Amino acid sequence: MVLVVGLGNPGKTYESTRHNIGFRVIDALLERRSALNATKSTFKGELHKEGENLFLKPTTYMNLSGESALPVSTFYKPEKILVIHDDLDLPFGAIRLKRGGGNGGHNGLKSLDKLLGNDYYRLRIGIGKPPLGWEVADYVLARFSQEEEQELEERLFPHAKEAIESFLEGKMEWDRLVSRYSLKPSTPKEKV
């Protein structure tokens, strides 16, 4: 069994923000897998079960994500946990798979690390650094530009879904999975 946790903040206010990319990937994945209806909401989150796999969107705020993931993990005892989250240290358009490591100041990861330890798998989705003069909190709670939304829909979400599907199948060695599904940012289109 694999527990896939998408990080984000609950509510319409945060729906399309940079910090909610984990929720959005879970939604895109479940839509494709026909499992969009939540089966349980007793773990401070929306929990979807499909076959042997669990998909969790904590309904706590980002900095309390571990309070949702811990009881799910304790009850179901998954063999692996994959966390999907935004990453300021990667440029927009980049995707990296990683196991363990530091939290990079990400409050959702801090909460998970505190309650679960940090030996879980991660799908890091780059959102880039805030522009000069922006506070980090304002940047991660801002919406993507129209061009970025288009790239999310056409390039990043399909790639992330494919990476997660391969991870869930468990047929590919970790190093090969990391190599195959790491994604560099797209190059800017030349202006004519």
Curated annotation (Swiss-Prot):
Signal peptide: none annotated. It holds the Pfam family Pept_tRNA_hydro. TRNA binds at Y14, Y61, N63, N107. The active site is at H19 (proton acceptor). Its main location: cytoplasm. Keywords: Cytoplasm, Hydrolase, RNA-binding, tRNA-binding. GO terms for biological process: protein quality control for misfolded or incompletely synthesized proteins; rescue of stalled ribosome. One of its GO terms (molecular function) is peptidyl-tRNA hydrolase activity. One of its GO terms (cellular component) is cytoplasm. The record marks N9 as: Discriminates between blocked and unblocked aminoacyl-tRNA. Monomer. Hydrolyzes ribosome-free peptidyl-tRNAs (with 1 or more amino acids incorporated), which drop off the ribosome during protein synthesis, or as a result of ribosome stalling. This is Peptidyl-tRNA hydrolase.
